[in-house]
Amino acid sequence: MSFSFNFGNSKPEKHMINYKQIFENNKKWIAEKKNTDANFFEKLNKDQHPDYLYIGCSDSRVTAEDLMGAEPGEIFVHRNVANMVISIDLNVMSVINYAVRHLKVKHIVVCGHYNCGGVKAAMTPKDMGILNPWLRNIRDVYRLHKEELNAITDEHARYNRLVELNVKEQCINVIKTAAVQERYLKESLPTVHGWVFDISNGKLIDLEIDFNKELKGIREIYNLMGTEE
């Protein structure tokens, strides 16, 4: 099956930030924070105790703190192309281990977004060079859900559904990790959530993944703790 996508030719006007302006903006940000809380940076400098690990896409339009309304120190963030959790990616695996075992986060969120360029690229029959091994993981998601996706006749709707299914599969990959299984067995934490951000209206959508159900199903095969269900 071939795919072609047309999201319109109109492009929003870009406000390109001037390099020097960045440092002026930083000064304003510091002043605003101090005006709100004189001890803001003193408290921020002590340590971090985030309750959330956020695994999201590198897309410049999707920033965790903004869409969640969070402050610095509240979210531990990892971002890559198409919010992937790949077992041989030492970067994301190190982040998960640190967040779960050291920071003791209570929630792990995998957040995708509609109109994701990484997912779109994976659905395009084209050699992407160095990106091929990375995008193959998204194509694997399509293969796992081929019947459902092929039954969707509208290409844009099919594309959005793949975004959602990719989030679900990455949540499953999080649950497969030893760090998550070990701590959950001891403390019933962390809980894994799957979200999608709709760029067109700014809404966060909870895919309402049944964590306990997924964990039980996964541990039938991926049980790393040597315990019986």
Region locations from a protein language model:
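Divalent-metal-activated hydrolytic enzyme cores
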Residues: 3-50, 82-103, 117-229
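N-terminal short beta-loop-beta anion/metal-coordinating cradle
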Residues: 33-74
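Short beta-strand segments
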Residues: 55-57, 79, 109-113, 193-198
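A glycine-rich, hydrophobic loop/mini-helix early in the fold
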Residues: 63-91
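Short acidic/polar active-site loop segments enriched in Thr and Asp
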Residues: 106
